[in-house]
C-alpha cells in the first residue's frame, strides 16, 4: 500500500527549487507578474472602469453629447419628431404639416444646399450694402430682426408677467457673437487667446460674404470694435439672475422720441407689434446703442451687420460656411469633435423657427388624452402636497401663509400644449 510521505516530498521540492537556475526563476516571476499586473492595476487605479467595463463598452460616450436617463428620453422624443416630420414630408395633413414637411425636406436636401452656396444670405447682404447714411441703419436693424437675426439687441415675445393671459414684447441685451460680454473686456491670457480665435472666425465669415481680401482686416476690426462697445454697455450675466433686471414695462408711445436714432417706434411696427407697452429693462444699453448709431460711421455698422448676418446664417449654408462655424462654435466654444448629423441640425432649426407648431403636432400624435389626464392628476397631487406643507410648516406666519396660498391658487399647470390656441397663420415656403 502506497503511503504518503509529506516530509520526503517537501524535501524533494525544496531540492528542485534549490538547484534551479536564478535565470529561470526570474523568468517565471517576470511572466507571472506580466500576466497579473494589468487587471490588478486597473482595479486599483480605476475601479469604476473595471467594475463597469461591460456596460461602458456597450454604451460609449457620444462624440457630441452625454449618456443619461434624460438623454435617452430626449433621443426617443427626437426620433418621434423625425417620424412625424417624415410623415409630414410624404403625406401632409393640413397646412401646418405642409409647412413642416417642406421645411424638413428642404433642410435634408444637402445637394440643393451645396448648389445654393451663399445665395440664401445674398438678399440680407444687399440690404446691408444699401446703407448710405445714419438714417438707413435703424431700418436695416429692423429688417434683420424680422428674419430672426438679433443684431445690436434682442427682441422677442414672451408672457407678460403682469397678466399671464397675454404676451408682451421684450427688448433685451444681445447682438454679440461671444456668449459672455465679459470676454470682450477681460485681459487675461486665456480670454485674449479666445478673442483672437474669434477674430479668425470673423475673417473667414466676412471673406465668405464677399469682402475683398485687402479689406478683411479693416472690416474685422470695425465689427469687433462695435461688438466691444455694445458689450461694455451690457449687464454682466450674473445680474440677469435677478428677474427685476429682465422685466420693466414701458409705454411704447414715447420710444420713438426717446431713442431717435434707433427709431424704436418704426422698429415695433416692422415687427408687427401694436401694443401700448413693451418691456425695456436696460435703458442704459439702449441709450448707448442710440448714441452709437448717431456717432459711428455707416461703414462700421455695415461691417458689423455683414458679420452678424453671415454668422447667423452660416450653419444653414453650404459646407465652407458650416465648416467655419463649427470650427469655432463647435470645437472652440463647445469642445465638440464633429458636427451633429444633418437631420439633427435641421430638427434643431425647425424647433428654433417653428417650435410651437411642431410641438402641437407632436402632442396630438404622441400625447393621448389618458396620458395627459394622468399627468394632470400627478400635478394636482403635487399642488395639494405643497399646500399641506404650507399649512403645516412652521417657517411662515399667518400673513406669509396667506400670501403663499394666494400664489398657489394662481399657479396654472398646462400639460403638453397651452390651453389657448396659438395663431399659426404663415405664408407657405415651398421646398428647395
Segments predicted by a language model, with ranges:
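Bacterial N-terminal signal peptides
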Residues: 10-18
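Active-site-surrounding "flap" and adjacent substrate/cofactor-binding loops of secreted or lumenal enzymes
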Residues: 41-46, 50-118
Amino acid at each position: 500500500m502506497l503511503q504518503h510521505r509529506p516530509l520526503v516530498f517537501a524535501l524533494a521540492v525544496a531540492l528542485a527549487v534549490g538547484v534551479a537556475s536564478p535565470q529561470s526563476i526570474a523568468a517565471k516571476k517576470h511572466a507571472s507578474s506580466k500576466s497579473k499586473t494589468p487587471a490588478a492595476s486597473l482595479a486599483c487605479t480605476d475601479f469604476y472602469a473595471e467594475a463597469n467595463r461591460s456596460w461602458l463598452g456597450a454604451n460609449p460616450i457620444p462624440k457630441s453629447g452625454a449618456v443619461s436617463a434624460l438623454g435617452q428620453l430626449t433621443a426617443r422624443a427626437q426620433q418621434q419628431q423625425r417620424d412625424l416630420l417624415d410623415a409630414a414630408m410624404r403625406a401632409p395633413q393640413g397646412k401646418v404639416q405642409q409647412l413642416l414637411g417642406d421645411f424638413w425636406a428642404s433642410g435634408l436636401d444637402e445637394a440643393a444646399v451645396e448648389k445654393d452656396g451663399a445665395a440664401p444670405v445674398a438678399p440680407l447682404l444687399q440690404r446691408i450694402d444699401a446703407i448710405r447714411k445714419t438714417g438707413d441703419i435703424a431700418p436695416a436693424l429692423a429688417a434683420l430682426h424680422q428674419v430672426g437675426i438679433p443684431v445690436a439687441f434682442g427682441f422677442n415675445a414672451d408672457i407678460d408677467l403682469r397678466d399671464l393671459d397675454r404676451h408682451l414684447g421684450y427688448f433685451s441685451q444681445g447682438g454679440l457673437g461671444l456668449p459672455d460680454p465679459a470676454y470682450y473686456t477681460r485681459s487675461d491670457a486665456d480670454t485674449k487667446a479666445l478673442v483672437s480665435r474669434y477674430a479668425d472666425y470673423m475673417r473667414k465669415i466676412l471673406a465668405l460674404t464677399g469682402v475683398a481680401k485687402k479689406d478683411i482686416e479693416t472690416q474685422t476690426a470695425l465689427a469687433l470694435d462695435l461688438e466691444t462697445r455694445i458689450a461694455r454697455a451690457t449687464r454682466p450675466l450674473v445680474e440677469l439672475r435677478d428677474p427685476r433686471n429682465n422685466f420693466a414695462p414701458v409705454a411704447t408711445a414715447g420710444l420713438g422720441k426717446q431713442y431717435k436714432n434707433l427709431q424704436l417706434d418704426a422698429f415695433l411696427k416692422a415687427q408687427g407689434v401694436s401694443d401700448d407697452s413693451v418691456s425695456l429693462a436696460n435703458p442704459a444699453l439702449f441709450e448707448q446703442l442710440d448714441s452709437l448709431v448717431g456717432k459711428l460711421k455707416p461703414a462700421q455698422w455695415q461691417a458689423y451687420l455683414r458679420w452678424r448676418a453671415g454668422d447667423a446664417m452660416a450653419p444653414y449654408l453650404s459646407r465652407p460656411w458650416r465648416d467655419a462655424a463649427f470650427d469655432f462654435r463647435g470645437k472652440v466654444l463647445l469642445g465638440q469633435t464633429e458636427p451633429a448629423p444633418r437631420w439633427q441640425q435641421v430638427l434643431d432649426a425647425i424647433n428654433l423657427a417653428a417650435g410651437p407648431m411642431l410641438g402641437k403636432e407632436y402632442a396630438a400624435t404622441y400625447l393621448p388624452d389618458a396620458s395627459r389626464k394622468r399627468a394632470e392628476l400627478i400635478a394636482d397631487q403635487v399642488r395639494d402636497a405643497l399646500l399641506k406643507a404650507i399649512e403645516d410648516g412652521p417657517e411662515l406666519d399667518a400673513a406669509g401663509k396667506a400670501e403663499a396660498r394666494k400664489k398657489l391658487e394662481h399657479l396654472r399647470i398646462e400639460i403638453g400644449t397651452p390651453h389657448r390656441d396659438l395663431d399659426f397663420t404663415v405664408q407657405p415656403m415651398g421646398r428647395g
